[in-house]
Each structure stands twice: as structure tokens, then as C-alpha cells.
């Protein structure tokens, strides 16, 4: 792992790089390395959803760091500043293997917090790594048996805009239409963390090949992911956004029947992008769970 030292205050994030499978570069933001407050507590590793990047965890990461924890928000392969897969392998198994590489490089107990794709990755990574390395798991609006219609809406949004936008304002309009329950920001400047300007157009900062591997559909792996979750002996928290069309109440009930030790919290003002929709409520729940 290499580090761009940046600022030295414990509450400030700095950019770090890990090595994934096949030596892929995985970039993250890190808070509180070597801070005395974090020495006896697990590291928190934040894993974003498909088409997102580490900046979706900016507020939550800062809140956890201000609580004294060692925190890392990681860009998955093919997302953000991490390397793209030369073979376009974005299967949950490949993503999980990358996370396991990061866990071994950290060499200390970790709490995994995963949203959507990151949650499925976390289930498999926690199962493979074992309870000595992964001590707790937080699943953010994802269960192995999620709703196909909600997943299809996400993919449709990503496919529709794969050719980029004329301007940041056009991108902001697309996001606003996709997330009508969110208040539209006054300025689209915040989207620059998720977009890259190339030849006069703004493109999402993820590999388009992420969408073109049908054999990597997590629905083909439902049984494997369910079995992995059922075999976990660590504390698990499932968080659902009440407005979500990806995780249904029936999906929650099914998961809790199969993983009865898991805890469940529903955020009334959030959808599938729960951490961003109601960050204060989300972060409060997560901080309390991690602190136990």
C-alpha cells in the first residue's frame, strides 16, 4: 500500500493505494491512520455501489473518523480512480477477491460497510476472510434476493447516459430525474467527483464494460451469496431505505428469516442510495452499531 501523505491532522483524509487481484491499483481515502483513538478499534472499510465511487462515502467517512475510527473509503475496480479490469471482470467474486487483498494488506480487524454492489461484495469477502479479519458487517439497501425491477432501473439509468453529457447541468438534470425524492443541489459542481471531462463531454467515472458482462449478473449467484450470509457468525446490520425499489419488505423478511441474528433498521426518508439520501440518520445508526 502506498500513501499520498497530504495533511497530517487525524480528521483529514488522505489518498492511499492498495493492490488488488492481478496487481490492479485500488485507490481510497483514508482517515486516522496511526491515530491513538483508533489503535484498539477495528478499521472501517466503506464499499460503494455500482457506478458510484469512494466520494459517495465522504460525509459518513468523515463522521466515523471524527468519532476516532480508522476509516477507508475504497474505489472498486473499474470505478473512480482505481484501475479498470483488462478482462472486464467485474464479477462479485473478483470484487470480493480485491477486498480480501486489501484486508490482508491492512492486517487488522475490519468492519465492512457495503452499499448495493459493495454490500454483496462484503458478504462474500466476510465469508471468505473469516471473523478474525471481518468483525462486523453493515449491508446498505441490499440483500441477495433484491428486486429485479429496481436493479433494472439502475442499469437503465447507467446505460442511458453512458455516452456522456454536454454539461454538468445536463448531468444534474439526469440525476434529479433519477432521484426525484432528493432535493436538487443549487450547483452541479459536486458532480465533478463522479464525472470526467473528455473531448468536451462529461462522462461517468467508471468503466462502461461494467455493464456489458451479463454472466456477472448477481442474480446468478443468489444461492451462493445467501449461503455465505447464513454462514456468517459476526454481527450484521441491514439498513433499508423505505423508499427503495431495490430491497422490498419481503426481501428484508426473507433475509432476516435466513439470517435471524441480523439486525434491521429502516430509514423513512431514504431510498436505495440511503447514505446520501438521509446521511445524518444513516451515520447515526452506523456509528452506534460500530461502537458496540
Regions of interest found by a model, annotated:
Residues 108-148:
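Conserved hydrolase catalytic core segment
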Residues 198-257, 266:
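Conserved serine/cysteine hydrolase catalytic core
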Residues 41, 49-52, 116:
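Active-site glycine-rich loops that stabilize anionic/oxyanionic intermediates
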Residues 1-43, 66-69, 107, 287-292:
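Alpha/beta-hydrolase fold catalytic core
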Residues 21-24, 29, 34, 58, ...:
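Active-site loop/oxyanion-hole signature of alpha/beta-hydrolase fold enzymes
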Residues 267-283:
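Catalytic histidine-centered segment of alpha/beta-hydrolase-like enzymes
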Residues 49-59, 71:
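Serine-hydrolase catalytic-loop signature spanning alpha/beta hydrolases and amidase-signature enzymes
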Residues 166-220:
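Conserved alpha/beta-hydrolase catalytic His-Asp/Glu region
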